[in-house]
């Protein structure tokens, strides 16, 4: 008897290694995945422009490397309408400098990226002077026009990007975080549009081969009571993949497989740390090569040791530990080019 709906995912033919560089763009769910990559030193760049939610703003971040900052002033603060609120400041010069620095960071990350992970958050957009903004920065609502993107708009914005960057593997996801401020029904319609757009972007690609997924190196410990993955050979898989684009079903995993409020944070909207960990495990078992799994285990253990709280730094034992840690770090930097 099965007491849960399992999302079956076939392992990707495009395996990620430590020779790759990953660029993550999109909603705060992509930030959560970036934090997981930090813990195993997987080469990546996460959201140089800050958190972006709608598909057009994410596409614009890739396409327009020479755009103007588009700065507005409100209540003593300067804001860039193409950036997250973390770029806002009382000093306009600092805002412009931060925007320019993020543009350079984006250009460098895009140039060296071999894998690009895109997380769509919402199909709702706000327009200021007939242009889609990335963030409203709590400006008066009367200054904006709110509307919902269509599937064709999203596809039209992304097809040229996929065609231009054929040397990179794009992984699309839809954020499982519900935008309840839009209304629950409106959120569902929004997510449906995002899912259909991703379906259209991956439709012409052949399905990925069915193989037994590798076990995640992160199972056990606090996560041992989470639902387990099931062999993908027994059921249809949600993985859609061609040489340059694939879809990872983070949305379906959280809403269907983890369909319980114990997997949500206190706000009942964001996934809990346990849910994020589980989705990360599923991502790892889908996209990481066997060698990468071993390397991740090695580097994750080092990360834990490096962030271990030392109670008595002046003790001989602590000094030996720090000396061994420094030697191990030097060795790993050489091995993995960290």
Where are these regions (language model features)?
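Basic, amphipathic N-terminal segments that precede the first structured/catalytic domain
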Residues: 2-111, 312, 319, 326, ...
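Surface-exposed cleft-lining segments at the edges of enzyme active sites
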Residues: 88-100, 134-158, 178-186
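Short amphipathic alpha-helices and their capping/turn segments at secondary-structure boundaries
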Residues: 98-116, 158-164, 201
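A short mid-domain helix/strand-loop element embedded in enzyme catalytic domains
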Residues: 118-140, 169-171
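Active-site segments of SGNH/GDSL-like serine hydrolases
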Residues: 121-123, 163-188, 249-253, 299-306
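Extracellular serine-dependent O-acyl
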Residues: 192-204, 245-260, 282, 296-298
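Glycine-biased, low-complexity coil/linker segments
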Residues: 209-212, 220-221, 239-243
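Conserved catalytic region of serine esterases and O-acyltransferases that act on ester linkages
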Residues: 266-267, 277, 282-338
């Amino acid at each position: 008897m099965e007491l849960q709906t399992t999302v079956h995912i076939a392992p990707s033919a495009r395996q990620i290694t430590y020779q790759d560089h990953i660029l993550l763009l999109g909603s705060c769910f992509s930030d959560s995945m970036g934090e997981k990559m930090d813990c195993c030193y997987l080469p990546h760049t996460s959201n140089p422009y800050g958190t972006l939610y709608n598909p057009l703003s994410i596409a614009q971040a890739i396409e327009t490397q020479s755009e103007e900052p588009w700065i507005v002033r409100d209540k003593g603060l300067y804001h860039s309408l193409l950036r997250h609120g973390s770029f806002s400041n009382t000093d306009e010069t600092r805002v412009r400098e931060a925007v320019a620095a993020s543009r350079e960071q984006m250009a460098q990350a895009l140039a060296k990226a071999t894998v690009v992970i895109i997380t769509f958050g919402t199909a709702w957009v706000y327009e200021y002077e007939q242009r889609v903004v990335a963030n409203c920065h709590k400006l008066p609502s009367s200054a904006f026009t709110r509307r919902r993107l269509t599937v064709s708009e999203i596809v039209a914005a992304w097809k040229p990007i996929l065609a231009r960057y054929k040397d990179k593997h794009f992984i699309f996801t839809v954020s499982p975080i519900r935008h309840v401020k839009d209304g629950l029904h409106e959120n569902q319609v929004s997510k449906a549009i995002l899912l259909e757009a991703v379906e259209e972007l991956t439709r012409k690609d052949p399905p990925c081969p069915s193989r037994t997924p590798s076990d995640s190196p992160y199972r056990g410990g606090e996560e041992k009571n989470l639902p387990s993955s099931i062999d993908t050979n027994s059921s249809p898989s949600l993985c859609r993949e061609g040489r340059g684009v694939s879809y990872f079903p983070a949305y379906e995993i959280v809403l269907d497989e983890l369909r319980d409020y114990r997997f949500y944070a206190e706000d009942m909207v964001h996934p809990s740390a346990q849910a994020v960990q589980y989705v990360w495990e599923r991502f790892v078992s889908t996209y990481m090569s066997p060698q990468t799994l071993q390397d991740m285990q090695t580097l994750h253990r080092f990360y834990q040791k490096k962030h271990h709280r030392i109670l008595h730094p002046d003790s001989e034992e602590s000094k030996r530990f720090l000396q061994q840690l420094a030697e191990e770090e030097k060795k790993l930097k050489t091995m993995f080019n960290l």
